[in-house]
């Protein structure tokens, strides 16, 4: 029996959630499965993956083949690297201690990368918010200046003529 690790769709249209499952390759996408390994939510930024890594690793070592999307998710979580290292240990190319050391180094590097990416995303959002706020303040100041000029014109026609000359003078100097 050919066993696949794949995504099983659930949720609703335009807001799909996926279960990461082990199933027979001949069964339909949302049909019967052997075991549920976790969930995948692509609607969040970054995508949320809840996965039982040890159980998934056991299935991969037993010969379950992941689909392309499932392989990407498993690679992101380190299951495929762990399999690669374990195959090296089984063949005698490296020792278990070296494999564990390489895997833990990869995990720490991955965590640092995730943290820096999350911080960059937060700082970008903050910078965008500040830029929008500054643009809004400029627009409000311009509107307030227009309202003030209209009040002056309505209250005192002589001052309005002086105001018109004051605004025309900088325009003429610029030309």
UniProtKB/Swiss-Prot annotation:
UniProt cross-references to PANTHER family, sorted A to Z: 30S RIBOSOMAL PROTEIN S16, SMALL RIBOSOMAL SUBUNIT PROTEIN BS16M
Assigned keywords, A-Z: Ribonucleoprotein, Ribosomal protein
Ribonucleoprotein is among the record's keywords: yes
Family: Belongs to the bacterial ribosomal protein bS16 family.
Name listed for the protein in its UniProt record: Small ribosomal subunit protein bS16
Organism encoding this protein: Cytophaga hutchinsonii (strain ATCC 33406 / DSM 1761 / CIP 103989 / NBRC 15051 / NCIMB 9469 / D465)
This protein's GO CC annotations: cytoplasm; small ribosomal subunit
Keyword Zinc-finger: no
Gene Ontology biological process terms from the UniProt entry: translation
GO molecular function: structural constituent of ribosome
NCBIfam families in the cross-refs: PRK14521.1 (NF011094), S16 (TIGR00002)
